[in-house]
Amino acid sequence: MEPEPVEDCVQSTLAALYPPFEATAPTLLGQVFQVVERTYREDALRYTLDFLVPAKHLLAKVQQEACAQYSGFLFFHEGWPLCLHEQVVVQLAALPWQLLRPGDFYLQVVPSAAQAPRLALKCLAPGGGRVQEVPVPNEACAYLFTPEWLQGINKDRPTGRLSTCLLSAPSGIQRLPWAELICPRFVHKEGLMVGHQPSTLPPELPSGPPGLPSPPLPEEALGTRSPGDGHNAPVEGPEGEYVELLEVTLPVRGSPTDAEGSPGLSRVRTVPTRKGAGGKGRHRRHRAWMHQKGLGPRGQDGARPPGEGSSTGASPESPPGAEAVPEAAVLEVSEPPAEAVGEASGSCPLRPGELRGGGGGGQGAEGPPGTPRRTGKGNRRKKRAAGRGALSRGGDSAPLSPGDKEDASHQEALGNLPSPSEHKLPECHLVKEEYEGSGKPESEPKELKTAGEKEPQLSEACGPTEEGAGERELEGPGLLCMAGHTGPEGPLSDTPTPPLETVQEGKGDNIPEEALAVSVSDHPDVAWDLMASGFLILTGGVDQSGRALLTITPPCPPEEPPPSRDTLNTTLHYLHSLLRPDLQTLGLSVLLDLRQAPPLPPALIPALSQLQDSGDPPLVQRLLILIHDDLPTELCGFQGAEVLSENDLKRVAKPEELQWELGGHRDPSPSHWVEIHQEVVRLCRLCQGVLGSVRQAIEELEGAAEPEEEEAVGMPKPLQKVLADPRLTALQRDGGAILMRLRSTPSSKLEGQGPATLYQEVDEAIHQLVRLSNLHVQQQEQRQCLRRLQQVLQWLSGPGEEQLASFAMPGDTLSALQETELRFRAFSAEVQERLAQAREALALEENATSQKVLDIFEQRLEQVESGLHRALRLQRFFQQAHEWVDEGFARLAGAGPGREAVLAALALRRAPEPSAGTFQEMRALALDLGSPAALREWGRCQARCQELERRIQQHVGEEASPRGYRRRRADGASSGGAQWGPRSPSPSLSSLLLPSSPGPRPAPSHCSLAPCGEDYEEEGPELAPEAEGRPPRAVLIRGLEVTSTEVVDRTCSPREHVLLGRARGPDGPWGVGTPRMERKRSISAQQRLVSELIACEQDYVATLSEPVPPPGPELTPELRGTWAAALSARERLRSFHRTHFLRELQGCATHPLRIGACFLRHGDQFSLYAQYVKHRHKLENGLAALSPLSKGSMEAGPYLPRALQQPLEQLTRYGRLLEELLREAGPELSSECRALGAAVQLLREQEARGRDLLAVEAVRGCEIDLKEQGQLLHRDPFTVICGRKKCLRHVFLFEHLLLFSKLKGPEGGSEMFVYKQAFKTADMGLTENIGDSGLCFELWFRRRRAREAYTLQATSPEIKLKWTSSIAQLLWRQAAHNKELRVQQMVSMGIGNKPFLDIKALGERTLSALLTGRAARTRASVAVSSFEHAGPSLPGLSPGACSLPARVEEEAWDLDVKQISLAPETLDSSGDVSPGPRNSPSLQPPHPGSSTPTLASRGILGLSRQSHARALSDPTTPL
């Protein structure tokens, strides 16, 4: 499986937060690149893990809180409040401070190297001139998008109220009043709110009996999901494929996410409240309910109808500001919804002493809200006893207070139920705030308002923070969600709980939990509860000797039962095993804190004594006892211990190595540490299990034998088995997150790299397995192709041969031939399909014998097809001839007396008999087929045609006699001859007579004879040529006079409409378009040219197949190499023309005008002629240099063989024939004519292209490899002006390089160019017009001293236009290509901890400028006047140094760069670049926004530095 790139992870995260992503992508991706470059030093993986994922959790919380009160409504902007369509509200990078005005501000997620990213408000400082950053507390996320929040900000500002929020968009920065921003828009329909569900559920769901699961809930109605529900994120399946980069969960320190999102944490929660229950303001939204397992499918994530949250206010027992959760609603989730917790919430571990408020203990020693407090020893003892009771394994818990016993009954009822959280993350622990940068935690908030007050200034989601050295007290039974989830309330249930709950994402998965979760009971000897309660703490500090410091604080009152000696030994050995090898050698320094005079566990001192005496080296190297009074009796006889006071701690360890309680700076969280290391234990077991299965799969693949039977190509079964392993899925999903969380522990610097190394071994093993699987699949494909080849060969020699032989005698009738043709088409299609399969197999493994068999069968197939087509043509001719004769005789027999001559003339004119040439051609065709029946039929057709001609001649002769003339006059007088009048021309049939010497007549175009009244007037003018001096003759037919020049309507004949209808068409005598005869003549000429072209191509292929004489001995080694290169190019031309091009031309025989498209389709192959031109000119120059040495004429010296001159002569023939064909094509066939013109241009370019390639090789003194600079676009001489210098230079324009050279004398008969200067086109800018001559343009370059610029004067306007157009197109193409480079660089390398991305330097990346639509920090490059648009110019920039346009249409970057041609372009009248014949107009100019928009080659595209960067950066030779 391919790894999921980091880019996909980034895009999916942004798409989930800022929909629609296609609108917000330009702005967001630019901000992403900016932060990656400036803050994370181009490490995309670190950016993703350290910034983007925590920021997603934070922003998801903000969005959910903002949308909470609008649950059930359909938002008009689905990304509100983070974005409004393309306008981004919460920025991921800083905006230019110059855009800020008084009263403006914007929101940004600010990265931090020392802690998780945070939300901040940025505005102008009161004095102006700088930006002020106001942190937004995590607690404020609950009411961020409210007017009260901004009012609170404005209260603390001395001057100037903030009122307008800045939004970033592709078009620029937008301003929106905060009052409008915080009010979302909804979609309405017919006066009702779309998506509102007024009748499906009551406002408050009735709660069931305590301890029972909630009743099943109906599904949501379509459209009721809001952005805060988490449904706008793409659904991701939990079962990832191999090394699929899934989202990692990082510890968001201080985040309140899971405090409200985790059900069953505690009975009383401290959460911020907005409005009181008295109804003064808006209420909280309907709460979402979690589903119980077993009530439905595991993927029931859509049925979450709104339900009311807490229906009661704060309980009397809870502290002020806390909301009491009713007992019947213990499974209720406050914030965020179930799926949102599963996707976006970070870890929130609960530490002992961080949750205030017990079940019924009242406030106890707690002081007034908001005042710092210090709890006495008694409360501390109560706290620790309650904490241990909550964490005890096996059900032993501390006695509960009377107020808690009632809740315990509900817990017992719920203890055996499945977990109420089906979709939440395992990190459901409450966590304290971490305050980086200060020496100690901040004090508690000044004020926590009650539920009835208006709004809190600062609230705590995970428990309040307090002042003092570790004075974090718990006033009731504390909870440690150490194993991934706990019971709904109170202490943990007796059932062992897994350390990490399976994350249910999307629609759930079918992974068994028992296969993924490792329960605590799997490690019965490691006392996790002792470490979680703070009894044993590996602080992460070291003493003065460098030993790891371990603190032991005995609980007060002591645990019941106390820990045994073996338990303590095992736990201490486990903590010692976590250290690095060097620290393990030094041993542990154990600090026993007895300042509170707690009773010591009986087994503690013997265990320490044993560990101090045993082992090599001993595990405990130093024992320190911290005490206020005298030593306890248990320690009086203990040897090797040092007794210390609090003042002596400074000489033991530095303050930064000690805990807060000991006067130091460290503040470890035991519960957090235990949770992470339990997950590490699970991770190691997963790694070991996966590693075993992967290695087993590798052995199976390496030992797999080649199958005897054919198998389907696909993923090998061992790999499928590994990928289906739920352990691998869990490892993919959680492994990286666990390792990242392990690094966040205080003791991580002291611990070894065992888990990471094991994780890396799994990564490498999976990579090895994938490589073997890919090799296995390739072998399968090869075997399958070879089997197909064998099957094709067997079919060709068997059924194929039999069917081909059946077409040898196609039949003697037209119907039989047509039926045979249908069968042959089906057979030919099958053969071609099988031949394609066979050639695909031969491409993998060449086999000359098989290839020959295929070629022979294909040739025979073509011969049969040709014979069948000729037989069909012959039979169709016979049928048409018989039909013509039959219709002629029928006309003669059915006509009345005196009309036969007219009918005969019409028949001859309208459908003339086949000419003698056509008969001779058909006779040759019959002889070629070798069919006696066809020859007999040919003779019969000829005899019948001659008989009909004789009959027509006989009737025409009779009508031309005097008797016939008198009969016609009488008939005319009786039928209305008075209508003609005295001036009517006398009709004469002499014009109908055939010429005296009958020559060949044109072949019949069709076989039917049209009625005389319909067709005579159309063809009458061309019946017979008039003699010189005679007036034009006319023929009278039913009231119409038809002369050779006009048609005059004499009557209202019923047939008139037929004439008029036909006259309007292209076949009418005055119809539009080319006349019929002219069109026939044009088609005939086209077919003649195509036939000549095919014959010429056949001769050319035969000539290329002839051997070339070997070169003479007088050739130098260099010339011999050129000779061999020319022969190689000639052989490639022979292969191309013989295999492909000849067949293409033969296929165009019936469609002559398709020849142009045929040439263009093989344009890449015709580029071989440019290479051939280069080699031939080198040979000619070299042979010319050798000729004086032969002391004779050229004939006596070496010469170029005729066989090597033939290819270029063929190019000339192609061009001549195509030009003639272009002249014969009619104007209405515009597309074919354009293709022919482009083909002619293609052929003409090859000669010039070859000379350009030769000139490139003639550049001397250049240390740059010009072959790596892309295609050579142009080469022309220019007058170059640089400052006061003016010189003549030959300039070469490559795709990546601009080179100046000077022409020197011939070297061996060829030109030579001396290298002068070179510049990268990525640093180049263009000004199209300089001066008034119209011949000059300017090229200038960034990163040069004083903006180095060169003015180039062309010899003609055409050359100038060609260069400027190509340079402009080149710069835009580089800009489009830069987008692809950016995407390709963000590629994941696996699931290991290796870096996934190497992004270019800051100076080489400016795609963010394009995506954000802002100027690229004065990276001015090119001002192209051909892209001018109306609009004001950008301020502060000169026309020669403009910055990027304010906006670039996104469509301009979604281009297929391969379609952009490098051919010269022209400018149309509008000033836009119009492509040449071969160009594809796929690249658009920039969006209107400035008078001279710019093209920034370097500013748009950051190319990687080539090996010759130094040669390009500094001039080596003066220009």
Swiss-Prot record:
Biased composition (Low complexity): 314-341, 980-996
Coiled-coil segments on the chain, per record: 828-871, 934-961
Native organism: Homo sapiens
PANTHER family the record matches: RHO GUANINE NUCLEOTIDE EXCHANGE FACTOR 40 (PTHR45845:SF5), RHO GUANINE NUCLEOTIDE EXCHANGE FACTOR-RELATED (PTHR45845)
Name this polypeptide is given: Rho guanine nucleotide exchange factor 40
Modified sites of kind Phosphoserine: S262, S419, S931, S961, S1082, S1433, S1438, S1474
Localisation per UniProt entry: Cytoplasm
Known role: May act as a guanine nucleotide exchange factor (GEF).
